[in-house]
């Protein structure tokens, strides 16, 4: 990517070509110095070209050092990505696709497919380059910047998507050949992506999910939490735009992360990542409630109850996990209070309340088999529900 950036920087190209041409000019003077008819050429090279090259040598070195800084490279990739996304939603591109839909249009279908593939390939490449920088960079701040830029790119894309012509979402070879989609061997999976128009978001979620697992393995809690926080920000934007397929993809991604977080918490007795994820997942569900996504809220409450039951079983060997159940209960309680303020149907509120009450009571477990710590923990949540 550095080579690509360098080849598109006009200042670097101008200076390098000036050096090359000046050097060629000097060599020509040296070879033909005896037969040189115009001695002014030697004066021009020695007293003008050479001083200019020397004068700008050090500033150019510092310019290149600054230009190749990780933060600057991230910013360039991000801005170029935004530029392409905004071009997709521009009037010119919409008019181009609309003209191509006409039967008597001079724009051929092959040309449309080629342009679509080029745009899709560039968007995929930008995401892959940002993902590579996560591995390349050893400092936390640049990696955090990559995660934020990736999240903001998705949010801008989601806002622009209603203005993008549907023909753009056709799955081309650029998407099929991308590493994130090569595991989709069934045509049905790709056709669903095309129908839901979420190939770009799914690609981003997979990269963020991989980064999240990597941060879990490295015990980098702050960066892992940032991944989930940025997913929540994307979810709020998707809820505002009423993008249901994207919201379902987000729920799937959060559930995948929950699996990894629970696995890490039970294996290494480390519940911090699980706590952070539960907090951000609950914020996402709250944003769904704010936009009256009843079915999705019900689905998320079901998942929370399922995870609570699973954590409750793991807590027999690790008592610190009881705190996570209390966190899940408290977060769902806050969501239920918000739902009550928005005057949802009383039956729906009752269903959600039942999910909370079953959060730490698996159907296959008898209360007589529970120890005192489990019963005490259960009583605390009963008090929380009563206060709610």
Language-model segment annotations:
Residues 1:
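Residues that scaffold, gate, or flank divalent-cation-dependent active/transport sites
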Residues 4-7, 16-51, 55-71:
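Transmembrane helix-loop junctions at the membrane interface of multipass transporters and ion channels
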Residues 66-388:
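Soluble C-terminal extramembrane regulatory/interaction domains of multi-pass membrane proteins
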